[in-house]
Amino acid sequence: MNFILTDFAARLELVARNPEVFKQFGRGVERETLRYSQNGRIATSMHPQGLGSAFTNQWITTDFAESLLEFITPVSHDIDVLLGQLDDIHHFTQTQLGEEKMWPMSMPCYVETEDQITLAQYGSSNSAKMKTLYREGLKRRYGSLMQIISGVHFNFSFPESFWDALHGEQTAEERQATKSEAYFGLIRNYYRFGWLIPYFFGASPAMCSSFLQGRETSLPFEALGKTLYLPKATSLRLSDLGYTNSAQSVLTIGFNSIDEYLEGLSKAIRTPSAEFAKLGVKENGEYRQLNSNVLQIENELYAPIRPKRVAKNGEKPSEALARGGVEYIEVRSLDVNPFTPVGITETQVRFLDLFLTWAALSESQPMDQCELACWRENWNKVVVSGREYGLELQIGCKGEKLSLQAWAHRVFAELRQLAEVMDSAHGDNQYSLACSELEQWIDHPEKTLSAQLLTLIQQNGSLGATGCELGRAYREQNLAHHYRHFSLQQMEQEVALSLIKQSQIEQADEVDFDTYLADYFAYLK
C-alpha cells in the first residue's frame, strides 16, 4: 500500500485559500534540564527558593527529581515569541542558580548512586504529596536513572480557521468530532513517519557508563573512557535503555478514534501488575507507590506523542478528552538539542510545523496492532542505528521495504509543496530554507545532531567533558541575555504568586492523605 496519497494536495489547496491559517498555529514548549554542580555532577541542593514554588509556578517547575528543572512557555502563535520567552525563562533561572549550571543534553551527567537523586518535593498539601508519591512509585518500578533523562516536549494545535477551510460550517458537536478524528489521523501518521524526528534531531548517541549501573544490555556499545556510545545511534533516550517501559508492552492502546484510545487507557489504569504488586503499596505505614496497577495514573503511559486537552481543576487527562475532544497534540520525541542554550531551535520548530501539518492533511488509514508493532520496529531501528546509510524500513505490515533515505525523500517531496504555501502566507522563504537544509541531512547522516554531538564527544574525550564545556558557555550566554518578552518584574511576580498559591492549597486541605488518595482512586473501584 502506498502510504503517501494524493489527497494531501487536494486538502492543502483547500487550506491554502485562507493564508491566515498558517499564521495561527498554537505552539508551546516544555524543556527539561538537570541542575549540575561545578564538577559535572548532578546537583544535590533543593529547588532554588528564588524560583518560587515548583508546584504552582506556571513557567518554572520540576519534573521527576528536585534537580530536574522544567520550563514551560505560554502558548504563542509566533515562533520568535515562543523562543524569546524560552530564552527569558532560562535567563531568569540562571540568575537564581548561583554557581550551578543547566546540563545541556538529554543523557544525564555523572551520577554516583541513585541515592543522589532526590525526588521532586512540592509542599505539604495532599495533592503535592501525591505528586511526590507518584515519583516514588516510578523510582521503585524503573529506577531513578531512567527518569532523569531530559527531553523537550512540543505542543501544537491548528486554529479554528484550519478546520473551517477543510469542513466549512459545523455545529459544536460536529467540530469536536472532526478535530478529534483529524488529530488521531495525525497521530497515526506520526507513528508511521515520525522516526524522521530522532533521525534529524536525536542527540543522545552516547551516555556516561555510570548510567548503566548493573543494568544488562545487548546493545554493542563502544567505549571512550567512561563514555559508552553506539556509532550509528541517534537517540538512546528513545531506546529500550531510555524512557521506554517494557511493563507497558502488555497494553494495547489504539489510535483509530478517541473512543478506542480512551477505552484502552481506561483499561490500562485498571490492569493489575503482579510485578508491581511485589513492591507493596503501603508497608509499615509508608506508601511505596500510588497503586500496583500497570499504570499508577494516566501520565505513566509512555508515548512518543499524546492527544491532549487542557484539564479543568480536578479533572484527569482522559476526562478532559472525553468532555471536549482533542484540543492539541504533544510531541514527546525530541531530545534536548545540545547546540543551543534553550534545547530547541527555530529550524526544528519550522520542521515540526511542516511535518505535523503534513501528517494532518495526508491520508491516514486505521492501524491495527500488527501495524503498530511495525512502526515501533522502525523507530527502534532509527534510534539505535539510524545513521547507518540505507537502513531499511517497512511501512505497514504488508507494505513496501525501502531505505530510510527513500522514505524520507518521498515525505519531503510533499513537505516542499507545503513549505512554499506556508512561505507565501508569511511573505518570506523561511519554511523552504528549513526544508532544504534538512533534506540535505537525509543523504548526509554526518550532518544530523547525533553525528555532530558524537564527533564533539570524541574530540573532548568524554560525554561529561562535552556537557561541562557546553554548559559553561550556555551559563554565560543565559546570564548575558536581556529580557525580550517577559520582564524581571513579571518573573519575580510569578515567583511571589506561586508561593502564595502553594500556601493557599495547603491551607485548603480538609482530609488526611489516606482519605485523599481513596477519594482520588474511587473511580477504579
UniProtKB/Swiss-Prot annotation:
Pfam families (alphabetical): Glu_cys_ligase
GO process annotations (BP): glutathione biosynthetic process
GO terms assigned for molecular function: ATP binding; glutamate-cysteine ligase activity; metal ion binding
Organism of origin: Vibrio vulnificus (strain YJ016)
The protein's name: Glutamate--cysteine ligase
Family annotation (SUPFAM superfamilies): Glutamine synthetase/guanido kinase (SSF55931)
Domain of life: Bacteria
Gene3D superfamilies, alphabetized: 3.30.590.20
Pathways per UniProt: Sulfur metabolism; glutathione biosynthesis; glutathione from L-cysteine and L-glutamate: step 1/2
Keywords for the protein's UniProt record, in alphabetical order: ATP-binding, Glutathione biosynthesis, Ligase, Nucleotide-binding
Family: Belongs to the glutamate--cysteine ligase type 1 family. Type 1 subfamily.
E.C. code: 6.3.2.2
GO cellular component assignments: cytosol
Gene (UniProt): gshA
Reactions catalysed: L-cysteine + L-glutamate + ATP = gamma-L-glutamyl-L-cysteine + ADP + phosphate + H(+)
PANTHER family: GLUTAMATE--CYSTEINE LIGASE
